[in-house]
Amino acid sequence: MPAVKVKENEPFDVALRRFKRSCEKAGVLAEVRSREFYEKPTSERKRKAAAAVKRHAKKVQREQRRAVRLY
């Protein structure tokens, strides 16, 4: 869990913003969302494999677009 020490004469809003940023960097909210409901190991593997395929297709598409523009 990220911890933020409030500096002297620091407004609460600024400290809260620093805390939110540190939570975002640590991935706390993403972790909570992923653990909100139980996901079977097979479903998790299937979801991760589908995400990998999607990332690869996106990467290939970007490379093809880049190759077309170089003339």
Swiss-Prot record:
PROSITE patterns: RIBOSOMAL_S21 (PS01181)
GO cellular component assignments: ribonucleoprotein complex; ribosome
InterPro entries, sorted: Ribosomal_bS21, Ribosomal_bS21_CS, Ribosomal_bS21_sf
Entry GO MF terms: structural constituent of ribosome
Coiled-coil ranges per UniProt: none
Keywords: Ribonucleoprotein, Ribosomal protein
Ribosomal protein found in the keyword field: yes
Chain spans, region Disordered: 50-71
Origin: domain of life: Bacteria
Record field: compositional bias (Basic and acidic residues): 60-71
Composition bias type Basic residues, residue spans: 50-59
GO aspect biological process, one term: translation
This protein's record includes keyword Glycoprotein: no
Family named by the database record: Belongs to the bacterial ribosomal protein bS21 family.
Name the UniProt record assigns to this protein: Small ribosomal subunit protein bS21
Species, as recorded: Pseudomonas syringae pv. tomato (strain ATCC BAA-871 / DC3000)
